[in-house]
Swiss-Prot record:
Listed Basic residues bias regions: 214-225
Region (Disordered): 1-34, 120-225
Organism, scientific name: Drosophila melanogaster
One GO cellular component term noted in the UniProt record for this chain: MOZ/MORF histone acetyltransferase complex
Biological processes per GO annotation: chromatin organization
Gene knockout outcome: RNAi-mediated knockdown results in early lethality.
Subunit-structure text: Component of the Enok complex composed of at least Br140, enok, Eaf6 and Ing5.
Biased composition (Polar residues): 1-15, 127-158
InterPro entries registered for this protein in UniProt: Eaf6
Gene of this entry: Eaf6
Protein name in the entry: Chromatin modification-related protein MEAF6
Biased composition (Basic and acidic residues): 159-172
Function: Component of the Enok complex which has a histone H3 acetyltransferase activity. Might be involved in transcriptional activation of selected genes.
């Protein structure tokens, strides 16, 4: 006869695979639920974005009609001065011309990035292209500055410290300095030799006057004889 403990062990062993099957089914059901929730959230996001786009279009159109209707008499953006100065008996064609407004006067539409992208996709793309061109130009100028700076550093660092400290480099420097000083001294001596001083000029003038006086005395003696 089998003991009751062996029966309990066999029963527990028989029930184990059933539990694993239940857990696997629960995990599958949970993954399916999360996918369904994610799909619902994506669908709701698309619906809300579409509603927001429609609302932005309505605001854009209403703002344009408001600016056109109040361009002659004044509005909350341009003020109310035109209401007092405007001529009410105007021509219909001139009225239509004057009703045109500038896009810069749009205040509510420009306050939202989504409205600018939805209502004016071409202008949004143009602004993006302009910003990209500006960034590329700035990058090119930065690269040019870095290359010139690198060239300057290479020219400055052409003679390293080891070569400057070497005795050959010192001898070359002393020879060059001696040649420069010698050339300056020789130039100074040439200038001294080439240009007479004031003392030599005075001596020459006195000698010439003395010789002139002697020649005058000799001529007088000859005539007297």
């Amino acid at each position: 006869m089998s003991s009751p403990t062996s029966k309990n062990v066999s029963e527990t062993n028989g029930n184990k695979p059933k539990k694993s099957a239940k857990t696997s089914s629960n995990t599958k059901g949970g993954s399916m639920d999360t996918r369904a929730e994610l799909a619902d959230l994506i669908k709701k996001k698309a619906e809300t974005s579409e509603q927001l786009a429609n609302l932005e279009r309505q605001i854009y159109a209403f703002e344009g009609s408001y600016l056109e209707d109040t361009q002659l008499c004044g509005n909350i953006i341009r003020g109310w001065e035109r209401y007092l100065t405007s001529n009410k008996a105007t021509n219909s064609k001139a009225d239509k011309r004057n009703r045109k407004f500038k896009e810069a006067e749009r205040l509510f539409s420009k306050s939202s990035i989504t409205s600018m992208a939805i209502c004016n996709p071409e202008r949004a793309s143009e602004s993006d292209s302009i910003t990209n061109e500006d960034s590329s130009d700035n990058q090119i100028s930065i690269n040019q500055n870095t290359t010139t700076a690198h060239d300057g550093t290479t020219t400055i660092k052409s003679t390293p410290k080891d070569e400057k400290d070497s005795p050959s480099h010192r001898n070359e420097g002393s020879v060059v300095s001696g040649m420069v000083s010698g050339s300056t001294n020789s130039g100074g001596n040439k200038d001294l030799l080439g240009t007479p001083t004031s003392n030599t000029k005075s001596k020459l003038s006195t000698n010439s006057s003395a010789t002139a006086k002697k020649s005058g005395h000799i001529n007088k003696k000859i005539r007297h004889r």
